[in-house]
Amino acid sequence: MPAPENRFKTAIHAGKPQIGLWLDMGEAITAEIAGTAGFDWLVIDGEHGPNDLRSIIDQLRALATSPAEPVVRVPVGESWMIKQLLDAGARTLLVPMVDSAEQASDLVSAMHYPPRGIRGMGAAVARASAFNTIADYADSASDGVCLLVQAETRAAINDLDNILAVEGVDGVFIGPADLAADMGYLGRIDEPEVQAVIEAAIVKIVAAGKAAGILTFNEAYNRRYLELGASFVAVGADVTEFANTLRALSARYKGGSAPQPSRSGY
C-alpha cells in the first residue's frame, strides 16, 4: 500500500486554484473548526505561531478527516526539522526566507530519502507510515511530499529564475510583508513598486511551470493574484478573523466602531 495522495500537491500541479487560511493560534480545536469551513488548505504556522512539534502533531490529527489539506510552515529550513515534521505526518512544507537556488536545492534533498536526498530513515515508528502499516511508505513517500519555498527578499527575487529551475520545488510563495520591508517599505505592501514586483514574480513563477502562492488580507489583491495564475492563495488568518469578529460584535452592542484591521497580512 503506497502513501496516500497529497490532494494539495495534485491540485496545484494541475493549476487548480486553492484557497487557504493561516492557523496561528497553535490549538487543535481551532484547526478542527477551520477544517469544516471549506478551505482547500490550512497553514499550521511554525514560524510566527506559538507551535512546537507536539502542537503541530495535534493539529495534524485534528485535520486528519478534513477535506482541507494541512500545510506546515517550518520555523527555518533545517534538514533535521524537516525530517521530524515529515515523520510526524506533514506532507506539504512551506519554508520561509529561501533566498537562493542553493538553499532550495538543499531543501529538496531534505525532503527525500536516498538516493534522491538525505532524509533519514525512521518513519516506521512515526505517524507518516501510520506506524508501519503503510508497507510501501519509503518507496512512495516522495510522491506525496510537496515543497513550497518562500521568496520574500530582494535576493530571492533576483535569483528567482534559478530557484524555479530547481527540480523538486513544487511552488514558490511570495511573502509580501517581508518583501515590502526588504524593499524599504515596512508595513506598506500597497506601494506600487512592491505590487509590481509581486505581480511580475507571480507571472514568472507560473510561466516556469511552478505553482505560485501568496497570503494577504486584501480581497482585491487576492483576486488579482488569482487572475495572474496564482494557484494557492491564503486569504486570512484564524487570529485576525477571531479578533476582528469579536471587536465588531462588541462595538455593535457597546457603541463606537471596531478598530480597522490591516489589509496586508503579517
From Swiss-Prot:
Database matches in InterPro entries: Aldolase/citrate-lyase_domain, HpcH-HpaI_aldolase, Pyrv/PenolPyrv_kinase-like_dom, Pyrv_kinase-like_dom_sf
Short name of any one Pfam family annotated for the protein: HpcH_HpaI
GO CC terms: cytoplasm
GO molecular function per UniProt: aldehyde-lyase activity; metal ion binding
Gene3D superfamilies named in the record: Phosphoenolpyruvate-binding domains
Positions annotated as active site in the UniProt record: 48
Residues annotated to bind a divalent metal cation: 152, 178
Keywords: Lyase, Metal-binding, Pyruvate
Catalytic reaction list: D-glyceraldehyde + pyruvate = 2-dehydro-3-deoxy-L-galactonate; 2-dehydro-3-deoxy-D-gluconate = D-glyceraldehyde + pyruvate
Site (Transition state stabilizer): 73
Cofactor(s) needed: a divalent metal cation
Sites annotated Increases basicity of active site His: 87
Enzyme Commission (EC) number: 4.1.2.-
Family recorded in the similarity comment: Belongs to the HpcH/HpaI aldolase family.
Function in brief: Aldolase which can catalyze in vitro the aldolisation reaction between hydroxypyruvate (HPA) or pyruvate (PA) and D-glyceraldehyde (D-GA). The condensation of pyruvate and D-glyceraldehyde produces 2-dehydro-3-deoxy-L-galactonate as the major product and 2-dehydro-3-deoxy-D-gluconate. Has weak activity with hydroxypyruvate and D-glyceraldehyde.
PANTHER family for this protein: 2-KETO-3-DEOXY-L-RHAMNONATE ALDOLASE, PHOSPHOENOLPYRUVATE CARBOXYLASE FAMILY PROTEIN
Protein name: Hydroxypyruvate/pyruvate aldolase
Organism: Agrobacterium fabrum (strain C58 / ATCC 33970)
